[in-house]
Structures are given as C-alpha cells and as structure tokens.
Amino acid sequence: VASLQRSVDSTDPANWSNTKLASRLMLVGVYGNGLGSIKPAVRKGLGGIVLFGTPPSNLAKQLAALRASAPGDRLLVSSDEEGGMVQRLTRLTGKMPTAKRIGQTMTPAQTQAYAYSYGKRLKALGVGTNLAPVADLKYPGSWTDRDGRAYKTNPAANGRYVAAFARGMQAAGVMATVKHWPGGGAVVDTHK
C-alpha cells in the first residue's frame, strides 16, 4: 500500500518539489551534436529541448534514446520550422518554402495539406512541437516581408493561413506554436 501511495504521489504535480515543477517547465536549446550532453538533465526531469544547429543524420534514434531516459518517457522535443531562413532540420526534412511564398502560391487548404505532410516528417524524427507558424502580418518593408516570414498583409487572410498551417501540423501529431504577436510586423488591435 505504501509503495502504491508513493507511486501515485510521484505522478501528482501537487506533490512535486518546486525544483521538479520548474524543471518540467524548462525548454532548453540543444545543438545537434550536443544531444548526449543533455541526457543527465533529461534523466532528472527536464521538460523539453529545442533543436538548433545541424542535426545528426541519426537524429530520430538519438531522440528516441533521449526520450527513453526521461522520467515516464516525457520529453517535449521542439524545432523551429517556419520555412525559408528559419528552418533547423532542412537536412533531414527537405526545404520548406517561406510563409510569403506559401501565401502567394497555395490556398489555405493546400497550406494545411503541406503542413500535414511536413509535420509527418517531423513526427517521424521524434519532434513533437513546431515553433511555428508566425502570425505577424506581412508589412511592406518590414522584416516579415523582407525575410518572407508572414503569409499575407490582410489580417483575416493571414489568419486563415496561420490556422491552416497549425491545423495541418496538429493533424500530423505535432503541436503548432503560433508566435510573435502582438509582434514585430504590422499588427491590428488584438483586443478587438
């Protein structure tokens, strides 16, 4: 009975120490060649990692081993896969066009299908969260336009593409992270 009670208590966050709670909320950046060095922190309950740098060719195998070392096999593995210049795993997933290019050449339905296909590649590698899409508006002359990191200038149209990308990722089993707003691009009043 005491053993069973300890087991129940260890899975209940209300019974966790502040250190354990904080570690589960941490997302640490790891360069592709440093996956082994993070293993001790993962064993102690680090909540997740964000992949940076050039990924090793055996990334899926390394991530599976890393996840297996996590308490309860719980490790959030994230990558930043917006497309264009912000894409960390190109060597393993292939290139994704910029959001600007997607907005020019695809419908929202095609965007969702593309994100689903790309999300399946991420999932196969062991990536469960994509730090994309960018929700900022494409504003002529801004970084979002220059770097191709936004779909559209019109808020409603942009929102359709952002939602389609997120739905595609999520259908593939990868969590999407809508980001940057109120943002660095042109934004509308988010309170309306």
Describe each region flagged by the PLM:
Residues 1-37:
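Boundary/entry segment of secreted carbohydrate-active catalytic domains
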